Design a protein with these regions (language model features):
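Extended extracellular/luminal ectodomain segments enriched in beta-structured repeat modules
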Residues: 366-367, 375-382, 430, 492
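Structural beta-strand segments of beta-rich domains
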Residues: 368-370, 381, 480-484
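Short, flexible loop/turn segments at beta-strand junctions in immunoglobulin-like
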Residues: 424-427, 535-537
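Short boundary segments that mark the start of a structured unit
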Residues: 460-567
């Protein structure tokens, strides 16, 4: 038997767990707790546990819906910054045991674990390091607090009743810490050791150099370019969001940037909020999964303990469109030729439908060209490229062209590819495509090239909002207010109420802004309204941003980015 030539690895490589998360693509966040009943985002630790009483709690519904709509893992918030715990912990009385829910005998973590085990849904744990309730959360008692946090980790991770059949795939350590909170030094290494002792296969999300990093914003959008590697010495609570968003082309540690965003404006459920539009979700998908990184979408349950019907419907619509994107790969089994290829790694591997096969060139050159013949003229507007990321991320520049009657025309160009790159362009008709690799850190390898036509609903969702949001000043100093103008361009013959809400970006609730909601009523013929948007002061020279979203009664939306500078 002929021995297949082995291609050398390059740079930091993903672990089996990181590679599995790349392949999962979609994860769900569940924010549910005492904040849900106070309709707030961040509690102060003084909320009354007796307010926690979800009368129709159904974790089977949560997991079933998420499973049916394409999510592969669920990260459940067991303790948020307020310190309220969703299981009866031995180390604090600020738990569900102090609530009227289940007559004080309930254990929400056990319930969602049973549901996850029943539906075989991977489960992750969010346990906030910042705890506004604990009297130990003070620099003078930080050793005792670190032990307290570690005890809770052990209590959860060692319990076979918790997790999907006792297993957690991800541990989430949020780096958020409110203005004025004590600046404790966390004993991360001791915590990490505890996690690996009980859940050795779990990936860890933290501000340190762990398997997962924050993507640098809460809008669910990865940077472009996006490198799934960093330099460990550059990671801390003070790491600039832009570094996290793009990664580091010279990175020495493989780090998956997790793109998190909420289905609604807030992380916890509020009656006054609505789910994002389908168009928004599709845009977020293309800017996260479409840039090679997992999307972590928060779906907050109601006070009753159910996923809201309107949210379920939006998830179903989202799943239907995403699934239909890949219904027909026009490049399946298409003929591919290349300027260079190795016998064991031919260009035909790009369209053979096999996950683990890939193309490799035969010689080191300054650029490489691959040409795809679809066999017939096809209409398409979405292209997919993949690298075999298990061998290391390599490509740093590419151009995609289509051949028209007058010659080759650029369809898209970019820098990084990574696990998966989706490139959405204008609808074109062509038989031949050409991929030119212009820059790479090592011998480039590619595992897939797909060609698709997006479903018609994606075009329908692009309808203009008929709203214009503008800001008096392009940038605001934190702590100052910004004057916002809202103009209505259509539907002027009718009265209309437009809702405006704040949404996170690189700046989050409690750092750059406090959540604000306006219900603005336009009279018939009225076209313009003015409002004042407040921001929060923060120290440092960095610039943060968040969004103001305006929603019409027919579901159309418009957004403006608010830039805030520190002082």
């Amino acid at each position: 038997m002929k021995k297949i030539e082995e291609i050398a690895d390059f740079g930091p490589l993903p672990s089996a767990a990181q590679l599995a998360y790349h392949r999962d693509e979609l994860a769900a966040f569940i924010h549910f707790g005492i904040n849900t009943f106070y309709e707030q985002e961040w509690g102060n630790g003084q909320e009354d546990p007796k307010c926690f009483n979800p009368t129709k709690l159904d974790t089977d519904q949560w997991i079933r819906v998420l499973k049916e709509t394409g999510f592969k893992r669920v990260i459940v918030v067991v303790k948020h910054h307020d310190g309220f715990v969703l299981y009866p912990s031995r180390y604090t009385d600020y738990t569900v045991a102090a609530s009227p829910w289940r007559d004080g005998e309930g254990d929400l973590l056990a319930e969602i674990s049973r549901s996850a085990s029943q539906y075989d849904m991977d489960l992750g744990l969010y346990l906030s390091p910042w705890d506004a309730h604990s009297p130990l959360y003070h620099v003078d008692t930080q050793k005792a607090y670190n032990e307290y946090y570690q005890q809770q980790l052990e209590e959860i991770l060692s319990n076979p009743l918790y997790g999907n059949k006792g297993k957690f795939v991800e541990i989430w350590m949020d780096g958020a810490r409110g203005e004025g909170a004590q600046k404790l030094t966390y004993e991360f290494e001791a915590w990490f050791e505890t996690i690996r002792r009980y859940q050795k296969d779990a990936v860890i999300f933290s501000t340190e150099a762990t398997e997962l990093r924050w993507i640098g914003n809460e809008s669910g959008r990865a940077g472009d370019p996006l490198w799934q590697k960093i330099r460990p010495e550059k990671l801390s609570e003070q790491t600039p969001p832009v570094y996290l968003c793009h990664g580091d082309p010279e990175g020495t540690y493989y780090s998956v940037g997790e793109a998190d965003v909420s289905l609604r404006s807030g992380w916890f459920y509020h009656d006054s909020q609505q789910p994002k539009s389908l168009a928004d979700l599709l845009d977020i998908y293309l800017a996260s999964v479409g840039r090679g990184t997992p999307l972590l979408l928060n779906v907050p349950p109601t006070k009753e303990g159910l996923l809201a019907e309107v949210d379920v419907q939006r998830l179903q619509e989202f799943h239907q469109v995403i699934s239909s994107l890949y219904d027909e790969d026009l490049a399946a089994e298409a003929e591919v030729t290349s300027s260079s290829e190795r016998a064991d790694y031919p260009a035909s591997n790009l369209t053979d439908g096999q996950r683990d096969s890939f193309w490799a060139p035969n010689a080191e050159e300054t650029s490489y060209v691959l040409e795809i013949d679809l066999g017939r003229s096809c209409t398409f507007n979405l292209l997919e490229i993949r690298e075999p990321i298990a061998k290391g991320q390599r490509v740093a520049g590419f151009i995609l062209e289509v051949k028209k009657e007058d010659g080759w025309t650029v369809f898209a160009r970019g820098q990084t590819i990574g696990y998966k790159r989706l490139l959405l362009g204008e609808m074109v008709e062509a038989r031949y495509l050409r991929l030119i690799l212009t820059d790479f850190q090592a011998l480039p390898l590619l595992s897939k090239l797909g060609v698709y036509r997006t479903p018609a609903i994606m075009e329908e969702e692009k309808r203009p909002s008929g709203l214009v949001l503008s800001q008096a000043a392009s940038t605001v100093i934190g702590g100052q207010s910004s004057q916002i103008s809202l103009r209505r361009l259509d539907g002027l013959e009718q009265a209309e109420q437009i809702r405006l809400v704040t949404e996170p970006g690189t700046g989050t609730h409690g750092t750059a802004y406090e959540d604000q909601i306006w219900n603005v009523t336009f009279a018939p013929g009225e076209t313009r309204k003015e409002l004042t948007l407040s921001t929060l002061a923060f120290t440092g020279q960095q610039e943060l941003n968040f969004y103001l979203c305006a929603s019409r009664e027919d579901g159309r939306q418009s957004r403006i980015k608010i830039k805030v500078k520190g002082s």
